């Protein structure tokens, strides 16, 4: 063909096409050819909030294709990819998805007073502050020490000196501290200053604001100079979190202001130390007011509350479920992180993780993990030992993952060699403390070229460095061995292959959802349902039931009870009766109207028996007369009015001729789906009433997952390329949009779905739970999994809100009429579907509409009105059939409409509903 630029949309098109031939795929496939395979233990999917961009099924498919034996799914704070991962692998397939999470870990185990020996709060303290050339005690130097000695609550001595760092002071440090090279040029070296300072601190407890930073410099320099260093240290930042919970930030100036302490010359050591001393003195008084007089009791107070944990710094941490107990504990941790400890991120306190770590494997994660960060800041050997002891295995990652640390815009740019040293240090710690070290990719997209999707999403979120994407793709075994060749061939093989496989083999192949059905139990529900139905049947049809009633009731009850469905009917019955008692009708949706048991138990007003007459007074009934038989397949209300031949009272007209099989299937074993429309203004009360039925804590709202939609993704893509001044063809735009679509944005709740937990079961054995959209201000709790993922396990009640019951209640209040007593074949009501005469208005008064159905739900749209004009309904059953034709694709247009227009059928003879299929075609 001939390629041209289309003059309408300016897109490349091919004209004068003579033929089409499929070309071979020219892309080079990525395959893992190494004889032994690694296992990826750190992988994100689209369920990592606006971060991961790959579908879990594609990730698993790739790992299986490469011959890997397992892969760990570890999304940020969420486990919503688990069910799709489970569906991606058959039960018989040896491939093993490992279920985990990258948690936001909070170290609430660290004490307010480290190395406490129970000293009195009125003991001797040295409150000190350091100024340094940077943040690393290994790489950087002390340039000033300021301290005050406090005895019995009074300042008794001061210590202040510059220290010659023997290196130039960085410009940013000079700007921050106002200390320049000339000020420290003639100052003593640390070799002279530190022994003097230690003498000043003898027999005292050390106090500092963010003590871990200052103490790390003291400890590192003591180690370097061979000086003893074993102090008790109190951190006023941690203490402020306990004593000043109303604060959101705990910087020195913020805490000083909150306590009314003056701070001058901030970022000068002696002034900051004096300010911290005043702060600490006020804190001591606050502690004494609580009856706390020593450091041990202060540490007891420091056991953090949920509010404190929400304000503490968090670190990344990998948690893997090694078995089914671990899965339940993982769901418990995910739930509590969302419900109790959520503040921008779902946080997991170390103390809680420690308590429920059985069945779990805990990894140190990425550069956002506390171990990596401690190494970067030069933490002491003692601190590193404490951190390492918490983990089951340690992680290292490719240098490319952390290359952002070498950029000039970082506070302290690192070199590539330093990045290697950080990983080498982790490997050494693993050897020293007998912890396996594994190499992971921290996968956020499947292939290198997929970074464009994450780049655009991050740009859409406002990240200025979105274009500097780290290579967070899934690597082959050979690629990973090459990444870590600087460790030596043997060690690289160990961290890439041996250890990852060993960790994977410690995890059993489990299902993330329980396979069993766990419906709720209401004691004696079988008998209750039977009694309710027979009592109502006798009330309507008399003590001796007509054979058709007896047979239908017996057949339905047998199917319902034998399959364990009675409890579902009783639940629906209780909800409907409660709503009716409170003055609101309930509309039954869908096929529940085909169940005669639902009618007799008061769940629905729809009677599915064949059209018939019955007498409320003497219980006369007529199912079989020729006059009645003429209305087979129609609605009983369409039959002519009659008086009872026995007592002369007007007969009731009932029956819609709906087979039971349309509800519970041909064998009667299909689980009933009882959808109910409650008044919108009563819906919340109906939801609350489920707690009355089942008890508090036994019901949850059905959760949903909100993902990036096509149109939103298109907006992200379009805006990104417009900002870059780049033109992309529509086909390329659509390709990129497809890669961005489906990424999780938020969570929500089904408008009426209630998940019921049986007594004796724990929700965590089925799903984690959370607040919708992590709204901590609501008391609504939803399932963390999308409700479709667990609807085979737990009963879902559809308690939907609808305008119709509300409108009916309002009309009843306005008119004084009982809606249930208005006959369905009322002549004036039926005339609304043919003209406007009953309304006593002309079509011109309502925009030219020829019918009076504008205000009738489902019949007031332009499409529905045209259907009414085409079909000319005469009976109520015609309206039912029209409603059947109005739902579904190509049911009316080009189908039933054509048959009616051509005179081949009428609305009464066309196949319009499932009931017609059962009654006429089977």
Indicate where each model-derived feature is located.
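Conserved non-catalytic scaffold segment of RNase H-like nuclease domains
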Residues: 121-231, 245-267
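OB-fold single-stranded nucleic acid-binding module
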Residues: 1-26
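Conserved beta-strand -> loop -> alpha-helix junction used to position metal-binding or nucleic-acid-contacting
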Residues: 95-106, 228-241, 297, 362
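Long, highly charged low-complexity segments
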Residues: 26-32, 110-126, 130
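Mg2+-dependent phosphoryl-transfer active-site scaffold
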Residues: 53-69, 76-85, 90, 99-100, ...
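Helix-rich "cap/lid" substructures immediately adjacent to catalytic or cofactor-binding pockets
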Residues: 530, 543-587
